[in-house]
Curated annotation (Swiss-Prot):
SMART domains: TOPRIM. May play a role in DNA repair. It seems to be involved in an RecBC-independent recombinational process of DNA repair. It may act with RecF and RecO. Belongs to the RecR family. It comes from the Bacteria. GO terms for molecular function: DNA binding; zinc ion binding. Residues 83-181 form the Toprim domain. The keyword Metal-binding applies. This is Recombination protein RecR. Gene3D superfamilies: 3.40.1360.10, 6.10.250.240, RecR Domain 1. The lineage of its organism: Bacteria, Pseudomonadati, Chlorobiota, Chlorobiia, Chlorobiales.
């Protein structure tokens, strides 16, 4: 069933393109927007445009940050342990570790994992930028790289590739401990489990 309004259908179609949003949920969201005052709709529209205009990837760690705050607040913080870099798949994983309050090192966001079936190779994610941080021109002083990728086949493949790439550079390569279910995503793991996984990391 389609609505007689092409504008409503266009909005439903736009919402249904979001990850995890089916057609039924998209209809519900469209109806919600329609019932809100114009001011609320304008606020939503401004927020969407603003995030596209202002948010960039940090020039150091590749996490998301505002254009006027680059490098990001984590990279520039004097309270972080600059000898450890935790490698994650996406910005939401950074938030997951930050919520635990236990990890005080730096991060590097790959923005994906190696997945040959999807046509994603090492050059398609932010591996080159990670290696640049370990070069003489990079941050310097890094002694440990923590691999904290999602426990999927693609995550394991990427971890293996990175460990083989990083070990010859003279840094210790570790991996967060098991205890996280295979196939799970880090953003949905509770803080206690994530903290234990980080604390129990082991060499690879």
């Amino acid at each position: 069933m389609q609505y007689s309004s092409s504008s409503i259908e266009a909005l439903i179609d736009a919402f249904s393109r979001l990850p995890g949003v089916g057609r039924k949920t998209a209809r519900r969201l469209a109806m919600y927007v329609l019932q809100q005052p114009r001011l609320e709709a304008e606020r939503l529209a401004r927020a969407l445009i603003d995030v596209k205009d202002r948010v960039i990837r940090c020039s150091v760690c590749q996490n998301v940050t505002d254009r006027e705050e680059d490098p990001c607040s984590i990279c520039t913080s004097q309270g972080r342990d600059r000898t450890v870099i935790c490698v994650v798949e996406s910005p939401v994983d950074v938030l997951a570790f930050e919520k635990t309050g236990h990890y005080r090192g730096l991060y590097h966001v790959l923005h994906g994992v190696i997945s040959p079936l999807d046509g994603v190779g090492p050059d398609d994610i932010k591996i080159r930028e990670l290696l640049g941080r370990l070069s003489p021109e990079g941050i310097g002083g890094v002694r440990e790289i923590v691999l904290a990728l999602n426990p999927t086949i693609e995550g394991e493949t990427t971890s293996l590739y990175l460990s083989r790439l990083l070990k010859p550079l003279g840094v210790e390569v570790t991996k967060i401990a098991r205890g996280i279910p295979v196939g799970a995503e880090l953003e949905f793991i509770d803080e206690a489990t994530l903290s234990r996984a980080m604390e129990g990391r082991s060499a690879v």
